[in-house]
């Protein structure tokens, strides 16, 4: 949709009755000054551009009439931080211009008593200068340094009360003001007192563009002390809702004999205290459940079956079982992330399982593959079986249904294929073969680690059996 320069589309012009989203990026609207956005209060702002001057004047006017900054923020749809910053800067410098540093302070409104005193001094001594009247006001303790009028203000009062007179008198007043300015620059009174007027510029003076409205000095309010009845009433209302509306706050203020503003501030402080207590309670509950990290029962883990090559010294090799039907393939527990399944013949005794390097098949977290020896008399290693959970114990002692493979069909296939025919024997496997030469009770004369494998060694028996996977028993794939 194309629009003319300076025109605001009617459909995207923010109206007072629209509800704008409270989260996410603000809406974008077209304004005469450029592409604007809508804040959370529904007001339009342009990022990087200062607030318009008429809104700044309105903020100061509302604050002059005693309206609180939070109410000004909601009515003008300007953020609370922007309102507070403008009011604070105006109170310090007397300027509402964006980025103003320094400038003149707001003009002091002279009280009628001070004006009468100035007229009295002038009548008693018609030749008294304005700066002399100012010093006499301070000397007689009519005003203090914060409330004493400036030299220009005294001159303006004298001109309005006694008339302009002749041109010479006006020139004398101007020279007098200039002389007082020069004196004030080098005196302590001039440094601590207010300056006469701001310098003129091409854009106009600061006084002409500023809203010449005195603001009440923000005084520290003493903390409100609530009685037991008031606290009980407020706590009951807080149990019903943490965010009462204006009607609930006014009704509660009448019952508790408080102002609506005090009730609103109390609920804000009470919500902050409630959030702090809720966070502390959650932290205490978390520490109570997990005093030293994770609890032992929360994450059951299997014992690690890792045996170092140097510490394992086979002293005896169990005999092979004569009945091949009773031979069981006992699966080794794998890491949770491992999905590969390995099939190792069980008639090869436990020492033969160490002849395959684990790095060849990707088991980097296991130094060696452990397969318990098969046999009815020694179903598992008792030293390792003591640390197993009942589920794993039942899995290892479950005999049946797994076909027997001859020793020559030595295959391990964690991926899609098995060992390659050109696979060489590892150094650790050769060392163990040297240690096992003195054993007389080997099941067969076939070596445990042949240098090469024939292609016939990869055939599988077409007998239907079961393989133990990660999620229980499943029928193997038939080739």
Curated annotation (Swiss-Prot):
Modified residues (Phosphoserine): 201, 205, 209
Function: Transcription factor that may regulate cell proliferation, migration and apoptosis. Involved in neural development and myogenesis. Transcriptional activator of MITF, acting synergistically with SOX10.
Pathological condition linked to this protein in its record: The Splotch (Sp) mouse mutant displays defects in neural tube closure in the form of exencephaly and spina bifida. The splotch-delayed (Spd) phenotype is less severe than the other Sp alleles.
Region of interest (RED subdomain), ranges: 113-161
Keyword DNA-binding: yes
InterPro entries: HD, Homeobox_CS, Homeodomain-like_sf, PAIRED_DNA-bd_dom, Paired_dom, Pax7_C, PAX_fam, WH-like_DNA-bd_sf
UniProt subcellular location: Nucleus
Organism: Mus musculus
Region (Disordered): 1-21, 165-228, 309-351
Gene3D superfamilies xref list: Homeodomain-like (1.10.10.60), Winged helix-like DNA-binding domain superfamily/Winged helix DNA-binding domain (1.10.10.10)
Record field: compositional bias (Basic and acidic residues): 172-188
Protein known as: Paired box protein Pax-3
A molecular-function term among this protein's GO annotations: transcription coregulator binding
This protein's UniProt keywords: Developmental protein, Disease variant, DNA-binding, Homeobox, Myogenesis, Neurogenesis, Nucleus, Paired box, Phosphoprotein, Transcription, Transcription regulation
Family classification: Belongs to the paired homeobox family.
Segments of this protein annotated with the region PAI subdomain: 37-93
One Pfam family matching this protein: Pax7
GO biological process: cardiac muscle cell differentiation; cell migration; cell population proliferation; developmental pigmentation; heart development; mammary gland specification; muscle organ development; myoblast migration
Ranges of compositional bias, category Polar residues: 309-329, 338-351
Location, primary (coarse class): nucleus
Complex formation: Can bind to DNA as homodimer or a heterodimer with PAX7. Interacts with DAXX. Interacts with PAXBP1; the interaction links PAX3 to a WDR5-containing histone methyltransferase complex. Interacts with TBX18. Interacts with SOX10.
Cellular component per GO, a single term: transcription regulator complex
Ranges of the DNA-binding region feature: 34-161, 219-278
């Amino acid at each position: 949709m194309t629009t003319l320069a300076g025109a605001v589309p009617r459909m995207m012009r923010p109206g007072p009755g629209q509800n704008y989203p409270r989260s996410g990026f603000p809406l974008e609207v077209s304004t005469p000054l450029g592409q604007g956005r809508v804040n959370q209060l529904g007001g339009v702002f342009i990022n990087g551009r200062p607030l318009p001057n008429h809104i700044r004047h309105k903020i100061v006017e509302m604050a002059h009439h005693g309206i609180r900054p939070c109410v000004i923020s909601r009515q003008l749809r300007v953020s609370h931080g922007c309102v507070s910053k403008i009011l604070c800067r105006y109170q310090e410098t007397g300027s509402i211009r964006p980025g103003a540093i320094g400038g003149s302070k707001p003009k002091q409104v002279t009280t009628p008593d001070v004006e009468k005193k100035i007229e009295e001094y002038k009548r008693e001594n018609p030749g008294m200068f304005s700066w002399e009247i100012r010093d006499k006001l301070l000397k007689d303790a009519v005003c203090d340094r914060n409330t004493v009028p400036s030299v220009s203000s005294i001159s303006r009062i004298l001109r309005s009360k006694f008339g302009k007179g002749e041109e010479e008198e006006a020139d004398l007043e101007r020279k007098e003001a200039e002389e007082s300015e020069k004196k004030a620059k080098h005196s302590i009174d001039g440094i601590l007192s207010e300056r006469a007027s701001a310098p003129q510029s091409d854009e106009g003076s600061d006084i002409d563009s500023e809203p010449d409205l005195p603001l009440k000095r923000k005084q520290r309010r003493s903390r409100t002390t609530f009685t037991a009845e008031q606290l009980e009433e407020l706590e009951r209302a807080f149990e019903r809702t943490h965010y009462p509306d204006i009607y609930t706050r006014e009704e509660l203020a009448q019952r508790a004999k408080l102002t609506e503003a005090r009730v609103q501030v109390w609920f804000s402080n009470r919500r902050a205290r409630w959030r702090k207590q809720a966070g502390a309670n959650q932290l205490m509950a978390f520490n109570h459940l997990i005093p030293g990290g994770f609890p032992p029962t929360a994450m059951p883990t299997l014992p690690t079956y890792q045996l170092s090559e140097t510490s394992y010294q086979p002293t005896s090799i169990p005999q092979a079982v004569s009945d091949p039907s009773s031979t069981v393939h006992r699966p080794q527990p794998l890491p949770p992330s491992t999905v590969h399944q390995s099939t190792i013949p069980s008639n090869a005794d436990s020492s033969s399982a160490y002849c395959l390097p684990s790095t060849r098949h990707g088991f980097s977290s296991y130094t060696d593959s452990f397969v318990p020896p098969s046999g009815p008399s020694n179903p598992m290693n008792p030293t390792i079986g003591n640390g197993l959970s009942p589920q794993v114990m039942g899995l290892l002692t479950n005999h049946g249904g797994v076909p027997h493979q001859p020793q020559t069909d030595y295959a391990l296939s964690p991926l899609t294929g098995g060992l390659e025919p050109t696979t060489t024997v590892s150094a650790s496997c050769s060392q163990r073969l040297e240690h096992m030469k003195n054993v007389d009770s080997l099941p067969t004369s076939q070596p445990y680690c042949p240098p090469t494998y024939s292609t016939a060694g990869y055939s599988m028996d077409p007998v239907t059996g079961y393989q133990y996977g990660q999620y229980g028993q499943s029928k193997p794939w038939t080739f």
